[in-house]
Amino acid sequence: MESIQDFTYPYVIKSCCGHGGSQVFLVHNEDEKKQALSKIKDEYVIQKLCSNIGKDVRVYVIGNKIVKAVLRTSKESFKSNYSLGGSAREYNLDNYEIAMVKQILNKFQIDYGGIDFTFHNGKAVFNEIEDAVGARMLYSVCDIDICREDKNVRWIHGNFDFKCNEFCYYKI
């Protein structure tokens, strides 16, 4: 395992518990490192900076199956989060990317989440697994309603002890 001293600038420091890019920092020097670490109150991850900054792919997963992928880009920031003003569009995974997702899904059971990839020299690089990702970005780029998709609702019903009640708007 590398230590923080083993990384050369620039690199990314991010909280293990952050969401929406709020605790993700691009660090160019010792002062920026200290400032970033002072804002992170829990465990953190350090990542080498990929060559294609401001661009990543989120793969939406339900029941350990790929639902859809979305390409996120930003012209103003190294963070491409939709919630921070990044743009989004549907994305078709290539065979290499599908194979990477399947390897991850073989090791982890993802009931509902996202698998994120950044790009280095034009090639997808695994970034992180997000639990309980928001679906607003997905709704903005395609017709899938991830909460009402028949197969998704059926998967939830088949894998949890609770059933729909008066608060459920889906009819099976």
Q: Where is each model-derived feature located?
A:
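Active-site nucleotide/adenylate-binding loops and adjacent lid/helix of ATP-dependent enzymes
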Residues: M1-G54, N95-I98
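Protein kinase-like catalytic core scaffold
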Residues: Y11, V45, K65-K68, G113, ...
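Anionic group-transfer/hydrolysis microenvironments
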Residues: C16, L49-C50, Y60, D116-T118, ...
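A short secondary-structure junction signal
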Residues: Q23-L26, A36, V57-R58, V70-L71, ...
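Short beta-strand-to-turn element immediately C-terminal to the catalytic PLP-Schiff-base lysine
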Residues: F25-H28, V61-I62, N127
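Catalytic core of tubulin tyrosine ligase-like
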Residues: I40-D42, S51, I62-E76, N81
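A long amphipathic alpha-helix within ATP-dependent nucleotide-binding catalytic cores
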Residues: F78-F126, N159-Y169
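C-terminal active-site "lid" helix and adjoining low-complexity regulatory extension at the edge
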Residues: H120-I172
